[in-house]
Amino acid sequence: MTVNKGISIRVNNVGDKVSYKENELLTNYTYHTNVVHTNSDKTQFEVTPLDKNYQFKVDLNKPERLGVMLVGLGGNNGSTMMAAVLANKHNVCFRTRDKEGLTEPNYYGSLTQSSTIKLGVDSKGKDVYVPFNSLVPMVNPNDFVVSGWDINGATMDQAMERASVLEVDLRNKLAPMMKDHKPLKSVYYPDFIAANQDERADNCLNVDPQTGKVTTTGKWEHLNHIRNDIRTFKQQNDLDKVIILWTANTERYVEILPGVNDTMENLLEAIKNDHTEIAPSTIFAAASILEHCPYINGSPQNTFVPGLIELAEKNDSLIAGDDFKSGQTKMKSVLAQFLVDAGIRPVSIASYNHLGNNDGYNLSSPQQFRSKEISKASVVDDIIESNPILYNDKLGNKIDHCIVIKYMHAVGDSKVAMDEYYSELMLGGHNRISIHNVCEDSLLATPLIIDLIVMTEFCSRVTYRNVDGQDGAEAKGDFENFYPVLSFLSYWLKAPLTKPGYQPINGLNKQRTALENFLRLLIGLPAIDELRFEERLK
């Protein structure tokens, strides 16, 4: 099956595990796990291996064009995203300040577009790698049709220029392609973002025509307005699928209130009653779910209240969140895991950031910063819990974790991150690791947006059924979609949303392994391991 630049992968000796029927891939897979029971003082462990049999079906027809609607289209991430798609689609080469000749456009930083996956070993035992997106058909970002909403009405060439993320030569070449694109009017409830954003809010759909001021009444009408925007965009561009992603300002946390947002019915009623704890992100998420369009939350606020998750469950609509994991936190999810897995005991992590883009400007408000602080702090929780030797009631079961974010206009999109990891070693020794990291914030976030959209679209084409006790070839029963919360996407998210009752996995290597093994099983390959018996056994 050829899915990437002429690459063809054929898996031999899979028997009846994998079959192709017209435009469908059917895979029979036995999932192996271990159920562990332990006594109260955790000195005795009883392990029971458990097998479950599933059949997966992949629709091999990826969309020729995929609709992408960004909330916050006119921001740094949104304008950079549109620019990246156009530059790659039209092969816009450009000059940079630090390189001779022309630079070709690329999708560096994107796991789906610029990374590889281990296929196996060759006859000499050497690892063989192929592009990540070559195992199964995935949509090409060049085929994205991009639109969206923003509370600021600047055209996209103006938004790109204001962001000043890209090289000047590239901006000049892309401006003619972007000047006719303007964000749709968005929802603006001032209480949810920093007051300093009011000066930008000139493109709002919730403006009272009599006073010319924004109003927070009529929230059900605002929801229906967004639903109509989605339908219109889909129809005008002849699209089969549209994915909505929030890359707008960080909102404050909403209160979880009984009778307001604790159930689907209460949430919808609260929207109709203009309840004060209904945020703009709630409006966009609910509209997307009701239109059966996947919705991804790229900011740290708690958009997915219990009522919204229930709404997604009832509508069988995919959702994912929260908060892009792009720089400092991604490194933290690797380094903290490494230290704890090595038997080293981190006792404090101090994380400092300053940045000068509008994200930093909005986060200078305490309520919005609190949302970000919660998101960034949770990344080490499951890592600590994985090692009761290092973290327990006697030694302490927490890490002192301090997070600081400051706005400094002068540095623009170049976010500066400084971290110090202070750890205990054997026999009273200590270790201190200090990291200074400077990066273009939006050029790290935009590839994540691309990956989230590509993988969400792919997951929407995968269904499964439980076939325990059945012959795979003669299996019966309806195929189902994934559970609506796409925890497979946790690799790209700071505070991964999970199925209620389950803990998130934050370790980056674990998250990547899950993605790789899922793609491998679909084409009949076993889960990857590093046993390497070819060299270790006689």
Curated annotation (Swiss-Prot):
GO terms (BP aspect)? inositol biosynthetic process; phospholipid biosynthetic process
The catalytic activity, as recorded, is: D-glucose 6-phosphate = 1D-myo-inositol 3-phosphate
> Cofactors per UniProt?
NAD(+)
Which subcellular locations apply to this protein? Cytoplasm
One molecular function GO term is: inositol-3-phosphate synthase activity
Classify the source by domain of life: Eukaryota
Going by the UniProt record, its keywords in alphabetical order are:
Cytoplasm, Inositol biosynthesis, Isomerase, Lipid biosynthesis, Lipid metabolism, NAD, Phospholipid biosynthesis, Phospholipid metabolism
**SUPFAM superfamilies from the xrefs?**
Glyceraldehyde-3-phosphate dehydrogenase-like, C-terminal domain (SSF55347), NAD(P)-binding Rossmann-fold domains (SSF51735)
Q: Name one Pfam family in it.
A: NAD_binding_5
Keyword Cytoplasm in annotation:
yes
Q: What EC number(s) would the UniProt record show?
A: 5.5.1.4
From the UniProt record, give the pathway where this protein acts: Polyol metabolism; myo-inositol biosynthesis; myo-inositol from D-glucose 6-phosphate: step 1/2
Q: List, alphabetically, the GO terms of the cellular component aspect.
A: cytoplasm
Sequence positions that bind NAD(+): 74-77, 150, 186-187, 197-198, 200, 247-250, 298-299, 323, 326, 357-359, 372, 412-413, 441-442
Record function comment: Key enzyme in myo-inositol biosynthesis pathway that catalyzes the conversion of glucose 6-phosphate to 1-myo-inositol 1-phosphate in a NAD-dependent manner. Rate-limiting enzyme in the synthesis of all inositol-containing compounds.
Record-stated family: Belongs to the myo-inositol 1-phosphate synthase family.
Self-association state and partner proteins as the record states: Homotetramer.
User: Entry's PANTHER family?
Assistant: MYO-INOSITOL-1 PHOSPHATE SYNTHASE
This protein is called: Inositol-3-phosphate synthase
Recorded source organism is Candida glabrata (strain ATCC 2001 / BCRC 20586 / JCM 3761 / NBRC 0622 / NRRL Y-65 / CBS 138)
What is the gene name?
INO1
